[in-house]
């Protein structure tokens, strides 16, 4: 029987771009696990995406996932926009390269392993797990240890 897992994610950036971090809460039955990491220079959207990728990668087998994010960018990107991006060879409707294509491709790969119900929650609205993720992400952003090698400054 496929495991039912709940995932909550958030990304944070101190400046955009700037130091950033992600926070994740994974829940299986009554057990919760948290993940967080900070990056020296990145963007908020990249951290929101990184949170979902890392969370899905942490699952050792295919699962039924309820994934809750406060990022419409992530939720709409993976459920709506990505289909046309892939058809166009990772280009937008106006023929420009898709921003954060490295992470969209990684997220797309992870989503094929699982059955995912993508949910959105308003950030900073008292949602327990979202607040936990926000605190984890902020703390990670305040103490960044990694380089976001895929980050490309806007021109």
From Swiss-Prot:
Q: Where is the RNase H type-1 domain?
A: 1-142
The cross-references to CDD domains, in alphabetical order and at most eight, read:
RNase_HI_prokaryote_like
Task: Summarize where Mg(2+) 1 binds, as residue positions.
Answer: 10, 48, 70
- How would you classify this enzyme at the top EC level? hydrolase
Q: Known InterPro entries for this protein?
A: RNase_H, RNaseH-like_sf, RNaseH_domain, RNaseH_sf, RNaseHI
Q: What is its EC number?
A: 3.1.26.4
Per its UniProt record, the required cofactor names are:
Mg(2+)
Instruction: Give the multimer and partner information.
Output: Monomer.
Q: Which NCBIfam families match?
A: PRK00203.1
Record protein name field: Ribonuclease H
Source organism of the structure: Vibrio vulnificus (strain YJ016)
Q: Write the lineage as a comma-separated list.
A: Bacteria, Pseudomonadati, Pseudomonadota, Gammaproteobacteria, Vibrionales
